[in-house]
């Protein structure tokens, strides 16, 4: 999945999606702003893009009047990341504290400079 950066905003636009082979399928579970929604809708309606499954959108929640709801070739899934499992969370936090205290590598650090 791509981070949302100035370089990736709108990356799934008409110009780039037209480079996909006829009948390609678009899946976006990363960031809504990666997709130019009007371009995707037109390419699906014209048949160049076979369909799409989308979990993220430029505006969330997706407004009831959005045309994606009425496009049978676009599947919309609920944007639900995951449930937090208490025991697993406590274990991960303890491991990170232990690594910090020992001067070891702390796993799972978010790199804000990369846009994550």
Q: Model-found features: residue ranges?
A:
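Rossmann-like adenosine-cofactor binding region
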Residues: 1-67
């Amino acid at each position: 999945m791509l981070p949302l950066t100035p370089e990736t905003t709108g990356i799934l636009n008409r110009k780039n999606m037209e480079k996909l082979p006829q009948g390609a399928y678009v899946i976006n579970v990363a960031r809504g702003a990666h997709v130019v929604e009007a371009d995707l809708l037109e390419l699906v309606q014209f048949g160049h893009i076979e369909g799409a499954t989308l979990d993220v959108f430029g505006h969330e929640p997706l407004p009831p009047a959005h045309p994606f709801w009425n496009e049978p070739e676009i599947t919309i899934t609920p944007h639900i990341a995951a449930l937090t499992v208490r025991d697993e969370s406590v274990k991960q936090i303890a491991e990170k504290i232990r690594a910090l205290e020992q001067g070891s590598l702390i796993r799972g650090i978010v790199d804000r400079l990369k846009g994550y």
